[in-house]
């Protein structure tokens, strides 16, 4: 039979039963496969079917129940013959490969951590000092730039220790801060602003850092990609503060800079499993991908286009789509 030669590490074995000695393929599916389904040769999924299966698996559905297996099988049948048992065994073998890779990564991480701890010259380094960022070139020696994550983007926090009370500057400073390291003037679409804001003003900005996340679909969308990717549609602001300058001559100076990014004119979607930046609004599908392709949503719905190859509906942020060849 076919079970003795299967291996979870091979992609082509995704639709065949896992290793079974003498198994005839009738009871190895735990009741998942159809009772009247005949024994067949090894199923080799097509590239389009692999992309759909991987997208569903990566979205969190690693062990679909019987009714969902039927829905997935109907979706895969658009690109070739497939049975319920093939879908069930593909997910079973895919879980085995995922667990094996996870064990290998954990072992490698443990070995690297052990090697790093044994070769460390000093054990007195505090976690805060170990996570400190590099000193920015061109700034005074006491100016340090820290990197932190806000709203899915890298923001920089600049702190300058200034014990001198004679510097009366409270607003505009000559220290240029570009949150994402934009070197050229005007490049990247960033605004530069400096203001002496209080702690309450900076805390008021915190609720708006994540912006209005576009919610397309919902719990009923079976194959929607997870929204936990940090993509937002509103501007991201990154506070960078320095010690304050009160009227007292003995305290330090504080300056806060806010580098805000203009709203992006593109959205991030997944096409054939690859994240891509696509423009908002109508898209010329024919000019972008060619004349003999169609765009299919991960749920199996075909996106309509007009006679000129323009999509008649806008793509949704974070959703997964597939480019397939137009049948001849």
UniProtKB/Swiss-Prot annotation:
Start-end of Polar residues biased regions: 1-11
| Superkingdom of origin organism | Eukaryota
Classification via SUPFAM superfamilies: Homeodomain-like
- Kindly indicate which segments of the sequence are annotated as binding DNA: 38-102
Q: Where is this region: Disordered?
A: 1-45
User: Its Gene Ontology molecular function terms?
Assistant: DNA binding; DNA-binding transcription factor activity
Q: Which GO terms describe its biological process?
A: adventitious root development
What protein name does the entry list? WUSCHEL-related homeobox 6
* Organism in which the protein naturally occurs: Oryza sativa subsp. indica
């Amino acid at each position: 039979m076919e079970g003795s030669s299967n291996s979870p590490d091979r992609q082509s074995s995704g639709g065949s039963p896992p290793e079974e000695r003498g198994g005839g393929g009738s009871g190895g599916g735990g009741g998942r496969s159809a009772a009247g389904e005949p024994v067949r040769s090894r199923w080799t999924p097509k590239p389009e079917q692999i992309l759909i299966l991987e997208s569903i698996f990566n979205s969190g559905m690693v062990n679909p129940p019987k009714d969902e297996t039927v829905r997935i099988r109907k979706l895969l049948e658009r690109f070739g013959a497939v049975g319920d048992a093939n879908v069930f065994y593909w997910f079973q073998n895919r879980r085995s490969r995922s667990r094996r890779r996870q064990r290998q990564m954990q072992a490698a991480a443990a070995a690297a951590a052990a090697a790093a701890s044994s070769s460390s010259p000093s054990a007195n380094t505090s976690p805060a000092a170990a996570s400190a960022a590099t000193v920015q070139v061109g700034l005074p020696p006491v100016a340090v730039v820290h990197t932190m994550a806000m709203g899915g983007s890298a923001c920089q926090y600049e702190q300058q220790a200034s014990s001198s009370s004679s510097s009366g500057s409270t607003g505009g400073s000559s220290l240029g801060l570009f949150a994402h390291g934009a070197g050229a003037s005007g490049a990247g679409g960033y605004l530069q602003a400096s203001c002496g804001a209080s702690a309450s003003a900076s805390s008021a900005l915190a609720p708006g850092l994540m912006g209005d996340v576009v919610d397309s679909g919902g719990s009923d969308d079976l194959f929607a990609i997870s929204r936990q990717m940090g993509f937002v549609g509103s501007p991201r602001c990154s506070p960078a503060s320095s010690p304050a300058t009160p009227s007292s001559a003995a305290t330090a100076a504080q300056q806060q800079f806010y580098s805000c990014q203009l709203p992006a004119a593109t959205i991030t979607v997944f096409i054939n499993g690859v994240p891509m930046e696509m423009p908002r609004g109508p898209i010329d599908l024919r000019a972008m991908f060619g004349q003999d392709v169609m765009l299919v949503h991960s749920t199996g719905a075909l996106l309509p286009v007009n006679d000129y190859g323009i999509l008649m509906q806008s793509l949704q942020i974070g959703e997964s789509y597939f480019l397939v060849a137009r049948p001849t």
